[in-house]
């Protein structure tokens, strides 16, 4: 036994000596080239072929990586793979906030087997730690992630032709089946995180739909038809040479349902929402970076664009270089103005209708404002904001929808006299759907009480509005009378000097005549 350990010690000493000699004699570059050569030789004589699918491709996220990750994380695929693989496969389980399902995934540097058309395919989740860099122009993730696909060489055509397309299609199907959309917001100052993501996301679970949306049915129908034609119009946009995008401008008083309409659009189309906060974007370059990182089939929203940044009527707050700085009255929430932050109007226009707006496809831009008269006309023209949707005060059809949503009351369930009162008052009351909803929520347990209070509120608003209109008319009449009196005084003031001049001139003429008579 002692001879065995003596032999092992001698062998280890010999290996250590040889390693030291190799490191001293051969430079690192030569050793690395030799290892690469050995790897290539091994691949030549190997019966398998390998494909690497990295998470990040240059500056962009690899969509194929996301598709593979979603495909492998589906519970059905994982169960099938585990049953056909060895029992040592390690899976990671995650559940993100607001999600209704548990997500499966491969652990770091673990493998899983998939079967496609009778062909066995091996997937490996490769995670490599990056070396710490003392300086870098762009932050890099601490880990380099990717999937390695291993198949037999004779099955190469199968993978390239159909398997990857199958994975992409399956991932889209899984996502539609899960019905989980994402709501994104831009990071402060577009500071890219470790994985080059300028957007932070949460699960989007807004219940608003076009069925529950309180607005005119005809207007709602036109919007749904326009959205449907857009989603199915890939061939049309390609044939006409137009970018596959659409712009909507929602304008109207606060509380009229602009945000609810955006949520209903996302639920109707199954699109993600990117809520762009312009006050967090410092310049046009960062605006382009944000657009580059948005996905297809998404709605890009800028709410209250007239308040977010001073991009209203041209000529106001304009610098010499043509840019529009933040309004000094607008702060970052802490009471401090962002120094040196500016986005030009041309940058925003190019964001919606320039070359950069073609990044990706099937995108919808939605701007909202409470004061459309403040916006620059260049921002509202067709091609940028294709459809202008006025979100006005609550009308009788919208009121009936709210009664159905909150109280489960149909038109035939209500007294015709009460309905007539509502129909007569709601137009003149100028009440928002949000105010009506608040009354119904307070009394949702008692439908009769809710209806009585709605009628009472509508009548009170009508009386107040009539009084307000009457006061305005009286004020206008008073102003008109004052203006007339002032004009009359001005005329008198102008006439009095002329009259004096005439009197003086007449008196002088009489004196001259008397002097002539005396002579």
From Swiss-Prot:
Its EC number is 3.6.1.-. The lineage of its organism: Eukaryota, Viridiplantae, Streptophyta, Embryophyta, Tracheophyta. GO terms for biological process: response to stress. Keywords: ATP-binding, Hydrolase, Magnesium, Nucleotide-binding, Signal. It comes from Arabidopsis thaliana. Residues 479-488, 509-519 have a biased composition (Acidic residues). Belongs to the AAA ATPase family. BCS1 subfamily. Pfam families: AAA, AAA_assoc. This is AAA-ATPase At4g30250. InterPro entries: AAA+_ATPase (IPR003593), AAA_N_dom (IPR025753), ATPase_AAA_core (IPR003959), Mitochondrial_chaperone_BCS1 (IPR050747), P-loop_NTPase (IPR027417). Its cofactor is Mg(2+). Transmembrane segments: none annotated. Residues 489-508 have a biased composition (Basic and acidic residues).
């Amino acid at each position: 036994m002692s001879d065995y350990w003596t032999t092992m010690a001698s062998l280890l000493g010999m290996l250590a000596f040889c390693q030291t000699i190799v490191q001293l004699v051969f430079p690192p570059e030569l050793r690395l080239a030799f290892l690469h050569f050995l790897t290539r030789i091994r691949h030549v004589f190997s019966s398998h072929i390998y494909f690497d699918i990295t998470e990040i491709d240059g500056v962009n996220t690899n969509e194929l990586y996301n598709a593979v990750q979603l495909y492998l994380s589906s519970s059905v695929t994982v169960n099938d793979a585990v049953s056909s693989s060895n029992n040592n496969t390690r899976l990671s389980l995650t559940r993100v906030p607001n999600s209704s399902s548990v997500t499966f995934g491969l652990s770091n540097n673990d493998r899983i087997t998939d079967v496609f058309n009778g062909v066995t395919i091996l997937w490996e989740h490769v995670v490599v730690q990056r070396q710490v860099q003392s300086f870098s122009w762009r932050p890099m993730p601490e880990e380099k992630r990717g999937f390695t696909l291993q198949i037999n060489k004779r099955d190469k055509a199968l993978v390239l032709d159909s398997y990857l397309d199958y994975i992409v299609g399956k991932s889209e199907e899984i996502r539609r089946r899960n019905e989980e959309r994402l709501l994104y917001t831009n990071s402060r100052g577009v500071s890219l995180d470790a994985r080059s993501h300028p957007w932070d996301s949460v699960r989007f679970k807004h219940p608003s739909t076009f069925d529950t949306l309180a607005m005119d049915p005809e207007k709602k129908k036109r919007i749904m038809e326009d959205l449907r034609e857009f989603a199915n119009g890939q061939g049309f946009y390609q044939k006409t040479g137009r970018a596959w995008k659409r712009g909507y401008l929602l304008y109207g008083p606060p509380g009229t349902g602009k945000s609810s309409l955006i949520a209903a659009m996302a639920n109707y189309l199954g699109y993600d929402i990117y809520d762009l906060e312009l006050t967090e974007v410092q310049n046009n370059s960062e605006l382009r970076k944000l657009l580059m990182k948005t996905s297809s089939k998404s709605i890009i929203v800028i709410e209250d664009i007239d308040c977010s940044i001073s991009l209203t009527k041209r000529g106001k707050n304009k610098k010499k270089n043509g840019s529009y700085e933040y309004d000094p009255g607008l702060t970052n929430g802490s009471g401090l103005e962002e120094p040196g932050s500016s986005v030009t109007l041309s940058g925003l226009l190019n964001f919606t209708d320039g070359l950069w707006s073609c990044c990706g496809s099937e995108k919808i831009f939605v701007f909202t404002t409470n004061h459309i008269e403040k916006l620059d006309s260049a921002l509202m023209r067709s091609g940028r904001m294709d459809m202008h949707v006025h979100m006005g005060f609550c009308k009788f059809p919208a009121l009936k929808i709210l009664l159905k949503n909150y109280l489960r009351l149909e038109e035939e369930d209500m007294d015709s006299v009460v309905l007539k009162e509502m129909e007569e008052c709601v137009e003149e009351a100028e009440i928002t759907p949000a105010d009506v909803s608040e009354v119904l929520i307070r009394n949702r347990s008692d439908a009769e009480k809710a209806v009585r209070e709605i009628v009472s509120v509508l009548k009170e608003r009508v009386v107040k509005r009539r009084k307000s209109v009457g006061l305005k008319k009286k004020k206008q009449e008073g102003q008109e009378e004052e203006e007339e009196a002032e004009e009359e005084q001005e005329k008198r003031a102008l006439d009095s000097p002329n009259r004096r001049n005439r009197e003086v001139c007449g008196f002088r003429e009489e004196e001259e005549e008397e002097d002539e008579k005396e002579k």
